Structure formats: C-alpha cells, structure tokens
Amino acid sequence: MALWLGLRAVLVVAGLAVLLQLIRGWLSSKSYVFNREEIARLAKEHSGLDYEVAFSKIIVELRKKHPGHILQDEDLQWVFVNAGGWMGSMCLLHASLTEYVLLFGTAVDTGGHSGRYWAEISDTILSGTFRQWKEGTTKSEIFYPGDTIVHEVGEATSVQWSSGTWMVEYGRGFIPSTLAFALADTIFSTQDFLTLFYTVKVYSKALLLEASTHLSQLGFF
C-alpha cells in the first residue's frame, strides 16, 4: 500500500511537471494581441489629463486598434479588488487565458503585498503616485504620472498608492494563476461575495468575447 501511494505521488508530481512545461512552451510560442510597450505608450500619452477623460480616450483608442477584443460599454464595470492587504478598484477591458488589460486605481491611500505571479504585469500611471519596495532591498521608489512600473514573473514587492492614483495595467502570462491572490481576501477576509460574483462575471464575459472573436477570425461566424 505504501509503495502504491508513493508511486501515485511520483506520478502526480511528474504529471504536474509535464503540464507546467507544456504551459511554459505554449506561453513562449503563442502570439499575443497586445504588448507592454503599446499599452505603456498609449497610457503615457494621456497621463496628466483628468483621469476619467484619459480613461475614455484610452478605451476609444484600444477599440480602434483592436476591434473585437475590448468589452463594450454595457459590460464595463468598476469592481472592488481586495488583495494582499490593499483595496482598489478595477475596470476590466480585455481578458483571455494569457493577457489582460484593465484600468486600476484607488480613491483612498492604500498599500500591501503585490502578490507573486506566473505573469508579467506592467502599470502606467495616469495620476497620483505609486510607491514600490522591492524584495531584497532596503529602500522604496516612488513613481509618478507617465511612469511605467514592471512587475516581473515571480517577483514580490510592497506596494503603496496615494489617494487619487489611477493607472492602466497590462498583464501577460498564465492569467488564471493570478486569480487565487486576487480573490483570496474577498473569500477569506471580506467575504464580499457580491464582488466575487462581479469579478467572475466580467472575466467570463471577456473570455466569451475572445472566444467569439477568435471563432469569427477562423470563419465560423
């Protein structure tokens, strides 16, 4: 029995290792809709404007450049995010299994743990300030409107945003791996299950939009 249990454990570990390698290969070889430089450049062009005006202009530009990949106005929704001890709000514009684009910010001073992801995440500031303290260092750095902060795969930092900080965020990697951190505080701390529902609903809508666009490009519609 012990031998059989040990063999099963080895097979499970080996299976997971193979699965991880397959995902890594897929992520490195697939094509992407967006890129970090494009999103950062677009956000920087509108930094310094009133953030609501900037958001509207950015959404219009993204829809022009990437038709079929940005949620329609009726599906856009600002949703609270509680994670790592901080609280903010996001408006998801695009999401798939490997990418997302969203608007993010906070109306109050907040800070906490960044999370550690199997994804690269970049934020370009439109207004306010973003303080980051990187793991292994003894000093923090403050970023201002127009600056882009890149959170590398596997990196962990302390983050702090002043009230009125708003930004455009782009993530690339295995996006489902980020959901555990993004939803943990909601499930185990705030128990705000309505926010959990909103989050799952908008992500599902984005996935359905991507699936529909992809099938249309293949000629199914």
UniProtKB/Swiss-Prot annotation:
What does UniProt give as GO cellular component?
Answer: cytoplasmic vesicle; endoplasmic reticulum; endoplasmic reticulum membrane; membrane; nuclear inner membrane; nuclear outer membrane
Keyword rRNA-binding in annotation = no
Signal peptide range: none
Q: Which residues lie on this side of the membrane: Lumenal?
A: 1-4
| Location within or outside the cell | Nucleus inner membrane; Nucleus outer membrane; Nucleus envelope; Cytoplasmic vesicle
Q: Which residues cross the membrane?
A: 5-27
Site Important for ligand binding: give positions.
Answer: D123, E169
Could you tell me which residues belong to the region C-terminal hydrophobic region? 174-221
Keywords per UniProt? Cytoplasmic vesicle, Endoplasmic reticulum, Lipid transport, Membrane, Nucleus, Receptor, Transmembrane, Transmembrane helix, Transport
**Membrane disposition:** Single-pass membrane protein
Q: Which residues lie on this side of the membrane: Cytoplasmic?
A: 28-221
Give the start-end ranges of region Important for ligand-binding.
96-103
Q: What is its main location?
A: nucleus
Q: How does it assemble?
A: Homotrimer.
Name the job this protein performs. Answer: May function in lipid transport from the endoplasmic reticulum and be involved in a wide array of cellular functions probably through regulation of the biogenesis of lipid microdomains at the plasma membrane. May regulate calcium efflux at the endoplasmic reticulum.
Q: What else is known?
A: Sigma receptors are classified into two subtypes (Sigma-1 and Sigma-2) based on their different pharmacological profile.
Q: Which family does the UniProt entry place this protein in?
A: Belongs to the ERG2 family.
Entry note about domains: The C-terminal helices form a flat, hydrophobic surface that is probably tightly associated with the cytosolic surface of the endoplasmic reticulum membrane.
Q: List the PANTHER family.
A: SIGMA 1-TYPE OPIOID RECEPTOR-RELATED, SIGMA NON-OPIOID INTRACELLULAR RECEPTOR 1
This protein is called Sigma non-opioid intracellular receptor 1
Q: Which organism is it from?
A: Xenopus laevis (African clawed frog)
What gene name is listed for this protein? sigmar1
